Amino acid sequence: MDGADEFSLKRLDVRKAFDRAAWDYDAAAVLQREVSERLLERLELTTVTPLRVLDVGCGTGRPTRQLLERYPGAQLLGVDLAPNMLKVAGRRPWYAPWQKRAAFVCADAAALPFAEMSFDILYASLVLQWCEDLDATLLEWRRLLKPHGLLLFSTLGPDTLKELRAAWSEVDGYNHVNRFLDMHDIGDALIRAGFVEPVMDVEKMTLIYGDVRDLMRDLKRIGAHNVTAGRGRGLTGRKRLGALSQAYERWRRDGRLPASYEVVYGTAWAPKFMPTAALHRGER
């Protein structure tokens, strides 16, 4: 298996991975929380007063709550592919008082069960990297936005986990790290989907670990371990983990191992006027 097929994401595998991670997710999702916070800060640069907001990939509901607080006059819908994530979100103490303004729906980010032009803001933090068809996903998101609605998203760029990818390449021929898209490719896809005025920037972030096992454990706890079709089957044995640890040692500095993340932040707008027929044809 090679080429694009090697990196084909299996939606059922993605769902299972995040379902398993749901109960421990908040304790391990350090990077996810930080990225979401920084993405939310970008809303301060806009003057949108939304009536309806969609939080795609809401996970355990943390960003949904923050959006509710930011927009007290808005209705919020949180969507996630993993049912267990939504179970955790629905049990949050903060959720009960806000049930009239918020709801959670289990659905795929690329095939959402809502009418076109339903939302003023679509918020999606660290979701796009799990969507197999970028063009179809962005077209779906644009379909859901009202004229001049705002898309606000973050995702991961190709330098994410570059140390882990390089270390695994010395151990075997399997793909162990998901492929991440370049910022410019995402920008081109936004234009193809009919969005206007896309703005993106990149930020490099680094998490520090004592050893490779800690890194692998964290990735599993947040559901972000490899789910591509080209991954090696079976358990990652002690011998292979030992070889991985040895290969990773070249990056050790001051007794610690880095795990690099390239975070892409983006905003884009739905056109002020969009004929209904064009939404279905994917035209601008």
Residue ranges and their predicted role:
Residues D135-P147:
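A short glycine-rich, Lys/Arg-flanked "PGG" loop and its adjoining helix->strand segment in the class I
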Residues D120-D133:
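A short SAM/SAH-binding and catalytic strip from SAM-dependent methyltransferases
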Residues A110-I121:
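A short acidic, Gly/Pro-enriched loop at the edge of an enzyme's catalytic core
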